[in-house]
Design a protein with these regions (language model features):
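A short, proline-enriched helix->beta-strand linker immediately N-terminal to the Walker B motif
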Residues: 149-153
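Short coil-to-helix segment of the ABC ATPase nucleotide-binding domain corresponding to the Q-loop/switch region
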Residues: 90-97
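Conserved ABC ATPase "signature" region
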Residues: 108-126, 178
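Conserved ABC ATPase signature
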Residues: 130-134, 138
């Protein structure tokens, strides 16, 4: 950990290019941003600008060509992909237990923790169900709990609702947001859905077209009746203004 690190995550002058026999394609060009502890940040940008590549770099599935990614001392990342990737031959309980099993954690402590998570997030009645017996929303909740079982400090969400129908997306985004806030997790969401980004995030980072740079960062402050949720956020008086602002940035001619 760097002595001068002030944030949970810092991305400094990050650049990355794809290298093929035909040549080099610059994807990310000196990208800079940071994330605070407990913050929920969404990244939006044109299709193909390198959003998912950025997450792969943050969790070290790829290595940058230049620049640096600095995560706090002994901090861990968890990665939730577009598909839930639940193993069809394992029960809900066994799917959630996969990470800790690989890490050889105590089975007694593990069982208590999983039972608590299943109860807290309305899956206790489906402990022994196989994935094909779960709804799309239940599968996503199970996938999120599985990711949280590894106790990540930063959760990376790569369009986790994209395979769901619209009504289920609204419900599951509320579920995921509630779980992350309850567990006091820091999250970075990649999405192409402007409304989703506004409804869930404390701050939105807008990337340019490839090669991507950070065009703008927008703090999100919404007035909601009662406690904020993604669903209630969509009816806030400021929501339309934020949508228009993000839309304008994404469609502004370079």
């Amino acid at each position: 950990m760097r002595a001068d690190l002030k944030h949970l995550l810092e991305v400094n002058n990050l650049s990355y290019a794809y290298h093929t026999l035909q040549g080099e394609t610059l994807v990310l060009d000196h990208v800079n941003f940071s994330i605070e502890q407990g913050e929920f940040v969404a990244i939006v940008g044109p299709s193909g600008c390198g959003k998912s590549t950025l997450l792969s770099l943050i969790c070290h599935l790829l290595e940058p060509d230049s620049g640096e990614i600095v995560l706090g001392d002994h901090k861990k990342t968890g990665y939730m992909l577009q598909k839930d990737h639940l193993l069809e031959w394992r029960t809900t309980y066994k799917n959630i237990a996969l990470g800790p099993e690989i890490a050889r954690q105590s089975s007694l402590d593990l069982s208590k923790k999983i039972d608590t998570m299943l109860t807290n997030y309305q899956l206790d009645g489906f402990r022994n169900a196989k994935p094909n017996q779960l709804s799309g929303g239940m599968r996503q909740r199970a996938a999120l709990i599985r990711t949280l079982m590894t106790e990540p400090d930063l959760l990376l969400l790569d369009e986790p609702f994209s395979a769901l129908d619209y009504q289920t997306r609204l419900s599951v985004s509320d579920d995921v947001w509630d779980i992350l806030k309850h567990e006091k997790k820091t999250a970075l969401l990649i999405t192409h859905d402007i409304s989703e980004a506004i409804s869930m995030a404390d701050r939105i980072i807008i990337l340019s077209a490839r090669p991507a740079t950070v065009k703008k960062e927008i703090p999100v402050k919404l007035s909601c009746p009662g406690e904020r949720t993604p669903f209630l956020s969509r009816s806030s008086p400021e929501f339309k203004d934020y949508f228009n602002l993000v839309w304008k940035e994404l469609n502004h001619d370079e």
